Amino acid sequence: MKNLFKGLMMSLSMFTIIPMPYVEWDEDGAKNMMKCYPIIGLIVGCVWFLGYKLINYLNISIVLKSALIMIIPFIITGMLHLDGFMDVCDAILSRRDKEEKLRILKDSTTGAFSVISVIILFFIQFGAVHSFLEYNKNPYILMFLPIISRNIVAYFFITIITIKESTLGSYFTKGTNIKDKVILILELALVCILFGSILGYIGIAILLIVAVAISLCVKKCFKEFGGISGDVAGFSLVVGEIVGLFSACLFT
């Protein structure tokens, strides 16, 4: 239990901007971080949901409301996953060989492809949030999407082989086993039940769409890079969430 709590504290300090007391990082805590990843999603989702509610009450234009609501998940996570999204887009869209793509993936320089990709992402996310406000969509979707995406990404992260250059990815997955996978599956099943109870079959359909989107991202990255990494996880998470948000606009 102590190591699980340490894993949660490490996850909060790593994946959010929430100030946390100092915890010494070690492998015992690191191997529990992925089990806690859905909890990070719950925190992000709750902040997004509450932000949506509060901003929606402001006497400002729907355009400004949409912009403010759109950036909430990026702000609370310190742009961490957005950085991974940009790095992976830069590498894949370069159309180079595998070794060069891996070099681009690790390169801290911001390329043109990453900038173009994030602009497209922002346009789609802005439009989706605008639709949420305009058509009064169920805001609980904003609470559940970060949980669903992180749960699925965490499962793949401890299941798929990590890129050998990804030392951080290996650090998080070292010591994980079948028990961790079972816990993540049970967590996802619980989320599925709760999400389905709110949105019915539509909720289950959105969850499956997100799962397929993330699976395709992981499969593509495995083909391009030979494994998974923190950047790949961030890329898959961002794509999964925007696909889920877009699907919610279409089907709810």
Curated annotation (Swiss-Prot):
<dbReference type="InterPro" id="IPR003805">
    <property type="entry name" value="CobS"/>
</dbReference>
<feature type="transmembrane region" description="Helical">
    <location>
        <begin position="4"/>
        <end position="24"/>
    </location>
</feature>
<keyword id="KW-0460">Magnesium</keyword>
<keyword id="KW-0472">Membrane</keyword>
<keyword id="KW-0812">Transmembrane</keyword>
<feature type="transmembrane region" description="Helical">
    <location>
        <begin position="190"/>
        <end position="210"/>
    </location>
</feature>
<comment type="function">
    <text>Joins adenosylcobinamide-GDP and alpha-ribazole to generate adenosylcobalamin (Ado-cobalamin). Also synthesizes adenosylcobalamin 5'-phosphate from adenosylcobinamide-GDP and alpha-ribazole 5'-phosphate.</text>
</comment>
<keyword id="KW-0808">Transferase</keyword>
<feature type="transmembrane region" description="Helical">
    <location>
        <begin position="232"/>
        <end position="252"/>
    </location>
</feature>
<dbReference type="Pfam" id="PF02654">
    <property type="entry name" value="CobS"/>
</dbReference>
<feature type="transmembrane region" description="Helical">
    <location>
        <begin position="141"/>
        <end position="161"/>
    </location>
</feature>
<keyword id="KW-0169">Cobalamin biosynthesis</keyword>
<keyword id="KW-1003">Cell membrane</keyword>
<dbReference type="GO" id="GO:0008818">
    <property type="term" value="F:cobalamin 5'-phosphate synthase activity"/>
</dbReference>
<feature type="transmembrane region" description="Helical">
    <location>
        <begin position="113"/>
        <end position="133"/>
    </location>
</feature>
<comment type="similarity">
    <text>Belongs to the CobS family.</text>
</comment>
<dbReference type="GO" id="GO:0009236">
    <property type="term" value="P:cobalamin biosynthetic process"/>
</dbReference>
<dbReference type="GO" id="GO:0005886">
    <property type="term" value="C:plasma membrane"/>
</dbReference>
<protein>
    <recommendedName>
        <fullName>Adenosylcobinamide-GDP ribazoletransferase</fullName>
        <ecNumber>2.7.8.26</ecNumber>
    </recommendedName>
</protein>
<dbReference type="GO" id="GO:0051073">
    <property type="term" value="F:adenosylcobinamide-GDP ribazoletransferase activity"/>
</dbReference>
<feature type="transmembrane region" description="Helical">
    <location>
        <begin position="38"/>
        <end position="58"/>
    </location>
</feature>
<keyword id="KW-1133">Transmembrane helix</keyword>
<comment type="pathway">
    <text>Cofactor biosynthesis; adenosylcobalamin biosynthesis; adenosylcobalamin from cob(II)yrinate a,c-diamide: step 7/7.</text>
</comment>
<feature type="transmembrane region" description="Helical">
    <location>
        <begin position="60"/>
        <end position="80"/>
    </location>
</feature>
